[in-house]
Amino acid sequence: MIVKADLHVHSAASWDGRSDLAALAQAAHARGLDAIAVCDHDVCTDVSGEFPVLLIPGVEVTSTAGHILGLFLEKPLDRALWKDGAPTPRAAIDAIRACGGLAAPAHPFSPQKLSDAALAALCPDAIEVQNARVALKNAARNRQAQEFAVQQQLAVTGGSDAHCAAEVGGCYTELDCTERSLAALRAALAAGRTRAVFDHACTWTQKGLSQWHGARRAPILRRCKALAYLCVCVLRDLFTGR
């Protein structure tokens, strides 16, 4: 059976996230998804509870050279990972695997902080090749990730990188599973039985709202910059559609 999962979603536990788990799950259900992976910034959010879709425990680790998704975590990452600041990509992947998770670089070419050779040397479990926010800014970076996955024979994932319920499902992953369960989804990803799907890009307004929300407790100068950016984003959607 094919299970549809958005494997990159942020909740209000992220500094720039704006929706709680219930709203994210309801949005996923309304868009025909079966599961979402909650991957907050450097935080392992508790996803226990009753929801209309499966919630996959995850994290998005900000490393010294890009972001690493941890999917299907069996326990939260040890906070010691961040004791000296941002961890290296290797340390992040090792920590994710130590917690039973699968590691996948997120939007690895937007921006590209590792050479192709260095990225390949990490031997990740999968790689994100469809990201709805990258599709907004530079869709060629998604294509570059797809080409890299083919070259390296890596499992692929797709995720919206949603920071609110309205963004859920912009990109998602189809997993060929034996059943609709976390264990079956994890097994499908580990075996590479996946397909990354692009549905639609994020809007500039949603991206601007994330920046504004993230700056709400920041010093006044940063808040002013975030507000100006939001205004530019709204105008960009209104007058250019890009």
List PLM regions with ranges.
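Generic structural signal for well-ordered alpha-helices
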Residues: A25, R90-I93
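Charged catalytic cores and adjacent phosphate/nucleic-acid-binding surfaces used
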Residues: M1-L7, S11, G17, L21-A22, ...
